[in-house]
């Protein structure tokens, strides 16, 4: 990566929504150690075109934070073709997809990079996941 580090790229296919999600992994993941995780819902208008200045280069900034931590995961969830804000049930579905991906990668403990001070993420226990700490982003 031009940002730094050797990243492993893994693609996950959501068969129900017919979407592909990407995980960028730096370093090794251990179930016994908290893993720095950034969940990012891709929006081409906000992320790539810079239409919302606060989101510009958010992926690059997340990668930099993970590099500083020496290992971690950046989970990029595809939004598909939708540019309309999702309702509450869709957001819960996205949490579930993200949790499934983390579980498949062997993550158990999370050090969450989040824009929200106290993100309300429910249902993680069902996937064997727990958020140990949250860091502002």
Label the model's feature ranges.
Residues 1-137:
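Catalytic domains of riboflavin
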């Amino acid at each position: 990566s031009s940002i730094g580090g050797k990243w492993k790229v893994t693609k996950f296919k959501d068969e129900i929504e017919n979407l592909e999600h990407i995980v960028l992994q730096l370093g090794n993941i251990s179930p016994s150690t908290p893993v720095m995780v950034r969940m990012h819902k891709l929006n081409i208008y906000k992320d790539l075109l810079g239409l919302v200045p606060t989101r510009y280069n958010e992926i690059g900034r997340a990668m930099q934070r993970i590099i500083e931590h020496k290992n971690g995961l950046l989970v990029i969830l595809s939004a598909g073709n939708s540019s309309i804000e999702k309702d509450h049930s869709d957001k819960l579905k996205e949490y579930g997809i993200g949790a499934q991906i983390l579980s498949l990668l062997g993550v158990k403990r999370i050090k969450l990079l989040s824009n929200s001070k106290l993100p309300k993420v429910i249902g993680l226990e069902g996937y064997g996941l727990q958020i140990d700490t949250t860091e502002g982003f």
